[in-house]
């Protein structure tokens, strides 16, 4: 199920980035990377693809956070307006990122007994 969530998140994000590419040429590499990841993960749960999804989805979320708050020098110097489409896309990417981290086993600390005890104090 987690792999399906990552595939869906990559595919949806790829579609959004591709649709916006005429206004934002810098979205083309993101759309291509997301398409490669979605297709690759649909064919195989290879660890390198899961790690790629973590890097790309996390990077897109971080890049948007910077673009919306301060701008990104040389690439996108002006602040990006916050829109509903952007927030929805980032929410989908965040779900995909969490699912990819789960596939990688990086969320095990959340369910450990020691972690649960320390968080409940």
Language model segments and positions:
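Membrane-interface extramembranous regions
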Residues: 1-121
């Amino acid at each position: 199920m987690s792999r399906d969530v990552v595939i869906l998140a990559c595919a949806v994000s790829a579609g959004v980035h591709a649709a916006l590419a005429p206004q934002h040429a810098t979205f083309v590499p993101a759309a291509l990377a997301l398409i490669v990841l979605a297709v690759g993960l649909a064919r195989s749960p290879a660890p390198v693809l899961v790690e790629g999804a973590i890097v790309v989805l996390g990077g897109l979320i971080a890049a948007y956070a910077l673009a919306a708050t301060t701008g990104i020098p040389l690439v996108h110097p002006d602040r990006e307006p916050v829109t509903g489409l952007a927030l929805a896309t980032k929410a989908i990417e965040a779900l995909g990122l969490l699912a990819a981290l789960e596939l990688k086993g990086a969320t095990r600390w959340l369910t450990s007994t020691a972690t649960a005890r320390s968080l409940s104090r």
